[in-house]
A protein has these predicted regions:
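Alpha-helical solenoid repeat scaffolds, predominantly canonical TPR units
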Residues: 24, 36, 87-90
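Post-signal peptide N-terminal segment of secreted/secretory-pathway proteins
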Residues: 41, 45-141
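Bacterial Sec signal peptide processing site at the extreme N-terminus
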Residues: 10-34
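Positively charged n-region of N-terminal signal peptides that target proteins for export
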Residues: 1-4
Length: 141
């Protein structure tokens, strides 16, 4: 009886974690969904019971990256120097997100028989350029 109760307890905790990360993903809190999924996948990332986290992580990563790049593009076109800090912070966030996921790779999607797709880009040039532009702006003003 104790074993059954213990198993039900752990199952409920695991299902709540998936539900919580799904809610974060659906509400647009992509970074929080990524953090929840990464923390869950740190131990035994290829376990069948953790496949939901892999799907959530793949979708949240793609949506967060797309949102950040769209915002950067918009801020760059605006050419308003007050946006330089947001541009710099977005590039740093893009890089941080990749470095958070990189140790887990490759992640398998067992149902589809493929690896999860996480397109990694090198943002070091953009980070340095935006940091220099921000520094110049702050220095002159």
């Amino acid at each position: 009886m104790k074993k059954i109760t213990l198993l039900l307890f752990f199952y409920s905790i695991l299902s709540c974690g998936v539900k919580q990360s799904t809610n974060q993903l659906n509400s647009g809190n992509y970074d929080e969904a990524i953090n929840i999924a990464v923390n869950s996948l740190r131990n035994n990332k290829n376990a069948k019971g953790k496949q939901d986290y892999v799907y959530i992580l793949e979708e949240a990563f793609a949506k967060a990256k797309e949102r950040d790049l769209r915002n950067i593009d918009s801020w760059s076109k605006d050419a308003n120097p007050t946006n330089l800090e947001q541009i710099y912070n977005s590039y740093v966030q893009l890089n941080r997100r990749q470095e958070l996921i990189r140790p887990l790779l490759p992640l398998k999607l067992l149902k589809e028989g493929r690896d999860a797709i996480f397109p990694m880009d090198n943002y070091s040039t953009e980070i340095i350029d935006s940091k220099n532009a921000l520094s110049n702006y702050l220095y002159t003003n």
